[in-house]
């Protein structure tokens, strides 16, 4: 098939579709992703330096993402620091520092194919180490420095050969100190970058979309490169030197995909912590933003401050976020975005980038979500039989399915359009909630006699749930205030604040146990039917609980 990339870009930039529904070129790209990638690669270079990568043959990420732009004054990363203000990392500086770090790493035994886990917050050090890992040819993994239990479980599952982090994060890496790489900045910058084969693993990523939680999912080089190519050029429409920003976007879901898309275009990733925007919403307006990712939390902050976003060329949202129609429409009106194009964009890190998108257009809020350009996909039976969906509703599945994590979201097709239909099972904004880890994190508290997490449907938009932590406290005198503080503190320290449950219910009963383990199915059924609530208020069950407490806890709560 022939793809006229110039016309495609004109359609996307003007927001004027040539036809209703999914554009014809996008449907053709699903059938011929190889031809589509080749056409994009030619158009992508434009007047810039040529790519070393060849679609379907080999991929030199370090050259195409970093070296190609190093002879310019372009900025790779612009990040805000609450103490020092805006900090920048240029492509030239990135190349030099990453090359030195790659040399240091090879002297410490890092080889092509080695599993290197990057434990960083988003910032200069992450970008330098990511580029160094690509230069060496490592298989990259990424973990933000959250809680100890969260990191320890994932490092144990990954079994990394090496870990790169900053010195002040070493306390989070107990048991893995021997794998930590040293950074002295004394390596030679002369280093020949690695070329990945198409099916060579470039990453093992802890995608929050993969079940069970904490399972590393492979990202092959071809998916990473094509994802960056399509997203940089089409999804976000980035040009050299333009900014992509996504404050508050989940790092495990969007790193490294957003970074790859930005760097391949020679653009600038604008990093802002949501907490900094809450303090000073005007920060988001200090630089022109080509593409702005907006979460409900960022929307509410900007709406409260009535911040006019005249510097934003277009914005996008994750279709898996709860959709408050009134709040979104009010935000668009109050922040001067009524004439600004928008899109829905869902990123899957193990697929290398966006898997569901819509063209950038000036229009009202919607739940449309088209399979991304250049992706082979199918609708599968929602019963997970593996057969194609018999109708126009099914599980969105990337092809070939046997080499990828199982699909989880429902896509519907109607009158030539595709709509997001929610996840097949309970999730939080499409992400797997680590319910077992949350329960384990509070199980050791002295007042806890049992804990489990129950997902409860919200009753609103399909597929949205609230997670309720049930804490059984037995016959103890109730102290909900202090208990809640201890629970929050324990979860934040061990797993990170993002994993706090939506609600905590203290149950003044003893849970049912089978072979010494909490019967989670019983707990969920009793809670959802209201039986636990009724028993808690029943004088008979209160007396039985007091008697059981007297008998069981003579030697301590675990007797």
How would you describe each model-predicted region?
Residues 63, 76-114, 119-127, 150-152, ...:
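Conserved AMP-binding/adenylate-forming core of the ANL superfamily
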Residues 73-75, 181-228, 234-244, 337, ...:
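Conserved pre-ATP/AMP-binding loop-to-beta segment of ANL
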Residues 136-139, 226-243, 251-290:
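Conserved AMP-binding/adenylation subdomain of ANL enzymes
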Residues 193, 202-205, 264-267, 290-293, ...:
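Gly/Ser/Thr-rich phosphate-binding loop
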Residues 376-402, 413-415, 479-480, 484:
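Conserved beta-loop-beta connector loops within the AMP-binding
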């Amino acid at each position: 098939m022939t793809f006229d990339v110039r016309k495609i870009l004109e359609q996307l930039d003007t927001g004027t579709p040539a036809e209703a529904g999914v554009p014809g070129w996008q449907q053709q790209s699903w059938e011929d992703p190889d031809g589509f990638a080749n056409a994009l690669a030619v158009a992508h270079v434009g007047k810039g330096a040529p790519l070393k990568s060849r679609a379907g043959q080999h991929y030199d990420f370090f050259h195409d993402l970093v070296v190609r732009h190093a002879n310019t004054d372009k900025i790779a990363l612009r990040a805000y620091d609450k103490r020092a203000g805006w900090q920048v990392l240029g492509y030239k500086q990135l190349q030099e520092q990453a090359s030195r770090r790659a040399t240091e790493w090879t002297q410490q035994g890092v080889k092509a194919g080695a599993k290197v886990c990057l434990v960083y917050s988003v910032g200069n050090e992450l970008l330098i180490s990511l580029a160094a890992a690509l230069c060496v040819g490592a298989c990259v993994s990424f973990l933000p420095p959250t809680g100890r239990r969260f990191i320890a479980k994932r490092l144990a599952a990954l079994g990394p050969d090496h870990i790169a982090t900053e010195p002040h994060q070493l306390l989070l890496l107990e048991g893995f100190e021997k794998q930590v790489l040293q950074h002295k900045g004394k390596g030679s910058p002369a280093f020949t970058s690695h070329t990945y084969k198409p099916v060579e693993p470039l990453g093992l990523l802890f995608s929050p979309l993969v079940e069970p939680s904490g399972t590393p999912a492979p990202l092959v080089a071809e998916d990473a490169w094509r994802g960056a190519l399509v997203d940089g050029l089409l999804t976000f429409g980035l040009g050299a030197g333009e900014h992509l920003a996504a404050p508050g976007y989940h790092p495990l879901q969007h790193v490294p995909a957003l970074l790859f898309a930005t760097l391949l275009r020679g653009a600038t990733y604008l990093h802002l912590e949501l907490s900094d925007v809450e303090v000073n919403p005007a920060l988001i307006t200090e630089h022109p933003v080509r593409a702005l990712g907006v979460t409900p939390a960022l929307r509410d902050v900007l709406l409260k401050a009535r911040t006019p976003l005249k510097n934003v060329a277009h914005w996008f949202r994750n279709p898996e976020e709860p959709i408050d129609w009134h709040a979104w429409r009010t935000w668009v009106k109050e922040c001067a975005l009524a004439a600004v194009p928008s899109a829905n964009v869902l990123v899957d890190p193990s697929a290398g980038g966006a898997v569901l998108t819509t063209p950038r257009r000036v229009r009202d809020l919607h739940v449309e979500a088209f399979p991304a350009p250049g992706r082979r996909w199918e609708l599968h039976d929602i019963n997970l039989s593996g057969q194609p969906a018999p109708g126009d509703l099914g599980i969105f599945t990337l092809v070939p399915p046997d080499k990828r994590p199982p699909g989880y979201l429902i896509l519907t097709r109607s009158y030539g359009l595709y709509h997001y239909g929610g996840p097949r099972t309970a999730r939080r904004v499409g992400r797997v909630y680590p319910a077992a880890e949350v329960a384990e994190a509070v199980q050791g508290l002295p007042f806890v006699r049992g804990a489990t997490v129950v997902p409860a449907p919200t009753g609103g938009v399909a597929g949205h749930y609230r997670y309720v932590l049930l804490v059984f406290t037995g016959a103890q005198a109730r102290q909900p205030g202090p208990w809640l503080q201890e629970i929050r503190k324990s979860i934040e320290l061990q797993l990170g604040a993002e994993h706090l449950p939506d609600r905590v219910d203290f149950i003044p009963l003893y849970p049912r146990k089978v072979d010494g383990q909490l019967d989670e199915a019983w707990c969920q059924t009793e809670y959802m039917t209201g039986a636990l609530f009724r028993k808690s208020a029943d004088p008979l069950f209160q007396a039985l609980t007091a008697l059981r407490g007297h008998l069981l806890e003579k030697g301590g709560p675990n007797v």
